[in-house]
Curated annotation (Swiss-Prot):
Swiss-Prot/TrEMBL keywords: ATP-binding, Cell inner membrane, Cell membrane, Ion transport, Membrane, Nucleotide-binding, Translocase, Transport, Zinc, Zinc transport
Protein name (record): Zinc import ATP-binding protein ZnuC
Main subcellular localisation: membrane
Stored Gene3D superfamilies: P-loop containing nucleotide triphosphate hydrolases
Keyword Transmembrane helix attributed: no
GO molecular function, one term: ATP binding
Chain's role: Part of the ABC transporter complex ZnuABC involved in zinc import. Responsible for energy coupling to the transport system.
GO biological process: response to zinc ion
Reactions catalysed: Zn(2+)(out) + ATP(in) + H2O(in) = Zn(2+)(in) + ADP(in) + phosphate(in) + H(+)(in)
Binding residues for ATP: G38, P39, N40, G41, S42, G43, K44, S45
Matching Pfam families: ABC_tran
GO cellular component terms listed in the entry, alphabetical order: plasma membrane
Length: 256
């Protein structure tokens, strides 16, 4: 495995006096795509928040590579419908972003023509891609996505996942994403973590799909049911087709 960009060692997190995560140990390598699945309340989003330093560890630790740049796509982001704000202006909050940098990020997210659109006029898929553009503004070494395809239909989700893979290839960044669907993960995932307050099992999608721990958690009928999102079409979704598909020492991987 390549040198990790981030790692959790014996990490436990408590929220409101309750242990949400217990003894999590996992390392993410440069360029690796890791997908996290698990039931609601299993600690998936909490784990991402701990990785970015938004939650303190009750025990254990998170080790980040020196100079690590992290891009984060949140689970939800509410925009006041009465607040006029263009995509370009949104990307410049809280500090101004040069126009060429914003244009590069939008192109990398697959929506190069949205700069002057109002945020409130975007479709679900367009909105998620703008959030992705914001996350890659500073060319991160690590990209974290919290249920980023929630609310998108299958074609929209598949197209978004394809864009994530392109970002990974372009930037050489590691990707850690939480999947809202227990049984569907991105086809390009190098590793899947099945989480329920702890790591139940991990491995390639094929290994996890057959793991007894996975079947015990989600039912005996789920054996081999961990499906993969693959983009099956040559055309682009959302914008191009006009449809709305959505209601102690580590070194970061260098930019490409």
């Amino acid at each position: 495995m390549n040198t990790p960009v981030i790692a959790a060692e014996g990490l436990s997190i408590r929220v409101d006096g309750r242990t949400v995560l217990a003894d999590i140990s996992v390392a993410v390598a440069a360029g690796e795509i890791v997908t996290i699945v698990g039931p609601n309340g299993s600690g998936k989003s909490t784990f991402l928040r701990a990785l970015i330093g938004a939650l303190p560890a009750a025990s254990g630790r998170v080790i980040r590579a020196p100079g690590l740049r992290i891009g984060y796509v949140p689970q939800k982001l509410a925009i006041d419908a009465t607040l006029p704000i263009t995509v370009s202006r949104f990307l410049s909050l809280p500090r101004r972003v040069p126009q060429d940098v914003a244009a590069e990020a939008l192109a990398r997210a697959g929506v190069p023509d949205l700069a002057n659109r109002q945020m409130t006029d975007l479709s679900g898929g367009q909105f998620q891609r703008v959030l992705l553009a914001r996350a890659v503004l500073e060319r991160p070494h690590l990209l974290l996505l919290d249920e980023a395809t929630q609310g998108l239909d299958q074609p929209g989700s598949a197209a978004f996942y394809e864009q994530i893979e392109e970002v990974r290839q372009d930037l050489g960044c590691a990707v850690v994403m939480v999947s809202h669907d227990l049984h569907v993960v991105m086809a390009a995932s190098d590793r899947v973590l099945c989480m329920n307050g702890h790591i139940c099992c991990e491995g390639t999608p094929e290994v996890v799909a057959d793991a007894p721990e996975y079947r015990a958690l989600f039912g005996t009928g789920t054996r081999g049911a961990l499906a993969l999102y693959r983009h099956q079409h040559s055309h682009r979704h959302d914008d191009d087709c006009g449809h709305d598909h959505g209601a102690e020492h580590m070194h970061p991987h260098g930019d490409r």
